[in-house]
């Protein structure tokens, strides 16, 4: 009886999940254009993200649902919750940037466009309330040709 061989495609999602839980870099290929925001230690470079979108750190913190001062202190900026929220935001923006016409337009969509499938909530409000997973599933469904 032949054993089924595991492919890297089958292992990759688990590695991404494990890496995300460990705080290591785990942006998917869909977010590759935004992966330049990851430093050598595997943390999201907060200042780089803020500069890239023309925001202050306070505005960026508000965008991901954290306190205004959170991103100014290194220990808090590197905390698991902070890094997780940043990665979720970057992944979602990375997924829609090609559809939106660029990362700036994707950020505008993220912050302001109501999504009917989620009761007209924005992607920003979904990430803030911890519902990035269902939003990613929804975006995957749309990418595969599904209806909104």
Predicted regions located by residue number:
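Non-transmembrane "mature" sequence context
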Residues: 1-148
């Amino acid at each position: 009886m032949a054993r089924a061989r595991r492919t890297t495609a089958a292992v990759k999602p688990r590695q991404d999940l494990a890496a995300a839980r460990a705080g290591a870099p785990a942006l998917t290929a869909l977010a590759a254009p935004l992966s330049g925001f990851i430093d050598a230690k595997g943390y999201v470079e907060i200042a780089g993200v803020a500069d890239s979108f023309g925001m202050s750190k306070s505005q960026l913190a508000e965008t991901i649902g954290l306190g205004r001062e959170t991103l100014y202190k290194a220990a808090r900026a590197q905390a698991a919750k902070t890094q997780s929220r940043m990665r979720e935001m970057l992944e979602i923006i990375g997924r829609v940037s090609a559809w939106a016409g660029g990362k700036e337009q994707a950020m505008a969509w993220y912050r302001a466009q109501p999504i009917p499938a989620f009761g007209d909530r924005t992607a920003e409000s979904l990430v803030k309330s911890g519902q990035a997973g269902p939003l990613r599933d929804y975006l995957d469904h749309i990418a595969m040709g599904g209806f909104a």
